[in-house]
Amino acid sequence: MADVKRVYTFGNKEAEGNGKMRELLGGKGANLAEMNLIGIPVPPGFTITTEVCSEYYAQGREKVVGLLRPEVEKAMKNIEKLTGMKFGDKEMPLLVSVRSGARASMPGMMDTILNLGMNDQAVEAVAKRTDNPRFAWDSYRRFVQMYGDVVLGMKPASKEEHDPFEELIDAQKEKRGVKNDTDLTTDDLKELVHNFKAAVKKQTGEDFPANPWDQLWGAICAVFGSWMNERAILYRKLNNIPAEWGTAVSVQAMVFGNMGDNSATGVAFSRDAATGENLFNGEYLINAQGEDVVAGIRTPQQITIEGSRRWAKAQNVSEAERRSKYPSLEEVMPAVYKELNEIQHHLEQYFKDMQDIEFTIQDGKLWMLQCRNGKRTGAAMVKIAMDMLREGLIDEKTAVLRCEPAKLDELLHPVFDKTAMKNAKVIVKGLPASPGAATGPVVFFAEDAEKMLKEKNQRAILVRIETSPEDLKGMLDAAGILTARGGMTSHAAVVARGMGKCCVSGAGELQIDYKARTIRVNGYEIKEGDWISLNGSTGEVYLGQVATQAADLSGDFGQLMELARKYSVLKVRANADTPKDAAQAFAFGAEGIGLCRTEHMFFEGDRIKAVREMILADDEAGRRVALAKLLPMQRGDFEGLFKAMQGHPVTVRLLDPPLHEFVPHFEKEQRELAKDMNVPYEKIAAKVELLAEVNPMLGHRGCRLGNTYPEITEMQTRAIIEAAMNVKKTGIPVHVEIMVPLVGNHKELRYQKNIIDQTAEKVFAERNDRLEYMVGTMIEVPRAAVTAHQIAEVAEFFSFGTNDLTQMTLGFSRDDIAKFLPIYLEKGILKNDPFQILDRNGVGQLIREAVFKGRGTRENLKCGICGEHGGEPSSVEFCHFAGLNYVSCSPFRVPIARLAAAHAALKEA
């Protein structure tokens, strides 16, 4: 490995690397090299590659330092040559910064050290050379503080305690009777350096390292070590950044923003990262170093006059006060500002994306320390992409790929007002099951949510230990849903996403007492009627009412969706159970309904009575009487769906849940039902007990119901076909697909298809008319995937129900996985939650096999998925490459799936 190049130098408009070497040099190192090559003023330095980070963890510190030493010493000589200073010299000491830089931007997640090379001799030399002793000692103080924290582990002893260095600074300021760090004198700073080093000796038992080379190796290894710190690991997990990528380390000659009033440091953006507005903006501080801007120790000032005036207006600062106390860089250093503005424009035009820039002004000279593609909100992401397309900076394909599918979520749901959030009190945190923001009074039962909306026109927060299909109406009428149990694909989560409702699930610390109608959590007692607020994007629950604002879907969003459609191969449908859901999905660009769950319709109004009548009937004749009552209701529902979808395909799933989900389980409700049906209570109780199942997910449900009670399939088929023919008569085309759930054996499906076909023929004969329809099945039992060649003899389409297919393939209950999932993720047993991101090697392999076998039997077999994975970007990508025809997801995930489908097609091309 000795011949492997581990260090790449840059400086004086030359560089050994370039902007295309992100994998090797990290984003920062690659861009520092590229900025040099295009003539931007950048302090000279070198970058140690990401491969060395992997070596560090594989071989250890000592081996890696040995491998690096010759190249680092050579690279340091290059900096010395370009600066005229020498590392470790007593007369002209070279000071450097040591920074991390992964290939994906991870702002603030890893460690940085400034002013490295400082010691008792260097500080005197710097003071003499600059004729500015205060600056020299301030730089020394900062170095000891940063090095002590990052390399020597000088952290607070507990979360209740403060940073040990900050405590010493506060004590010094109190002793001197001053408020700001900048008010400390040279002698104060000398005293602080002495006290800092004493604190290091006391806590570590070692003297603070004085040798610059020892300092450098300590810093380089600490930056590599920070790749595996807690916050970096969490950030990578949240942003799907692989741990094996590693970080590069960039070492640069220091330039100083803290040399006096002609020096400054700042951060700028070429466009507004929050709104996407084409407005150069940023903050700076006079006489400061980089970390001061982000640390918030002093109030940063705005770079532009326009930005400064906007800031002053928001802060109720007068124009006179703004000019005197908080002037913009444009006003204070107009020549430097002009150069900075030209550079940011040059960088944006060159990299063709919004730039996040770090800069330092040393004694009136501007230096660029970093540029990277800036992080941005979902709204800004779309606006910037579409603006740059209109400006001719990027083409259509780039505009589509520039927008992250998952970030579209931010545009589709209500959000909390940012100002109100600052004062919000978090009482518990659960899983961010369905994005958005919701606020309202607490209720514990679905009927109370319905009642509150009906009587008070107020949407409540429905709080449940867990939800069931019976809670559907209450969930619909609620502002948001909070559950103590359940994961990201639990009933509450799936249904809430389908409705576009804010939902926080799996908040296990909640102690819910249905009888007392109270919640106890973390020392709070919340009673029914008390207000709480839910953040479905973070999983946080707040005490009281937090103001919300509706998401604003601009014209740019619509244009992006049109581009997504243009470049997609995979179609996107929606899971929708009502005409309202269908209309919402259609508005978001759904090209059909991939899953209509007929059981959800059974809970509307008085229908549940007819359903229960059917379930509790003694014989087939009794069931048929009850089903006859349901027929017109179901027919009306389907008519609404067919009309809403305007000729796009509608896939209707026949009854799926076990019958016990539809019957009352409490004595009071059972007695009311007995009274309504005019039968003894004991008969109802006995029947309910008889319907109970030990493992209902694998029990009497799906096609098993239709095969044991054929009259259910008959009624539903008749309702579907009659509705389709009624809508067809109005001149609206209808494309009907009838889907049989939970098939594991081709004979099950054949039996159901015979019932469907016979019933359809009866309707055609009665009406003296016909229409085309298809019969297919959900592939959710692993055996169905393995025997897909047989099932395709009967089925005209496959729809993969990935929720249940995942449960049965992995043997995980999606409602109970929260008990062990965090441990499995932490230990690396699982890479992702398989109910959120499709398990490609297991479930995915079954899907590929089923598609291959199915199309071997029926060449034009249409295949799609209708589980929640249909709206998850990486799962959508898998579906594209697996050769599926469509994905189907919740209406509010349709835009995400559409964009993900376009990404997959463009990546393949």
Segments the model singles out, each with a brief description of its role:
Residues 1-424, 458-461, 468-473, 479, ...:
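Nucleotide/phosphate-binding sheet-loop regions of phosphoryl- and nucleotidyl-transfer enzymes
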Residues 77-89, 519-521, 761-770:
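Short mixed-charge
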